[in-house]
Regions:
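C-terminal structural segments of small proteins and small subunits
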Residues: 67-95
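A general secondary-structure signal for short beta-strands and their flanking turns/coil
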Residues: 1, 56-58, 75
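Negatively charged, low-complexity tracts enriched in Asp/Glu with abundant Ser/Thr
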Residues: 1-37
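Short, surface-exposed beta-strand/loop "edge" segments at domain boundaries and coil↔beta transitions
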Residues: 12-15, 46-51, 67-74
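Short beta-strand-to-loop capping motifs
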Residues: 5-10, 43, 63-67
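Short proline/glycine- and acidic-rich turn/helix-capping motifs at secondary-structure junctions
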Residues: 37-40, 92-101
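Short secondary-structure junctions
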Residues: 25-32, 43-46, 86-91
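A short, structured beta-strand/loop element
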Residues: 38-60
Length: 101
């Protein structure tokens, strides 16, 4: 599993911005899979999902993929969309990688 912290600039509500961009069709490669107690998104091509935890501070996301050797594809797609669509709203992206046992 991969965990991410996305720090916004100037109080940007990144969770709402991501949901809006997906629902408006600006981000076509992802779809909202659930909106209950937070939300999660799925990539239309790559396996796995990204689960968001609602916090007042940074955006917290966990990338979950049953096939750990394919996690990088989901990570690459997500970080790429963040950098492309929200570069003016994001101060930093921190990525934590869990060890494989």
């Amino acid at each position: 599993m991969v965990h991410m912290q996305v720090l916004g600039r100037d109080g940007a509500n990144l969770q709402a911005a991501i949901k809006k961009a997906i629902s408006d069709g600006a981000i076509k490669s992802f779809e909202v899979a659930q909106v209950k107690g937070g939300f999660k998104i799925k990539h239309k091509k790559h396996l796995g999902e990204i689960r968001f935890t609602k916090t007042p501070g940074p955006l917290l996301a966990s990338l979950v993929c049953k096939n750990r050797s394919k996690e990088w594809q989901l990570l690459e797609a997500f970080v790429g969309r963040l950098a492309y669509h929200f570069k003016n709203d994001i101060a930093s992206i921190n990525i934590q990688l869990e060890r494989e046992d």
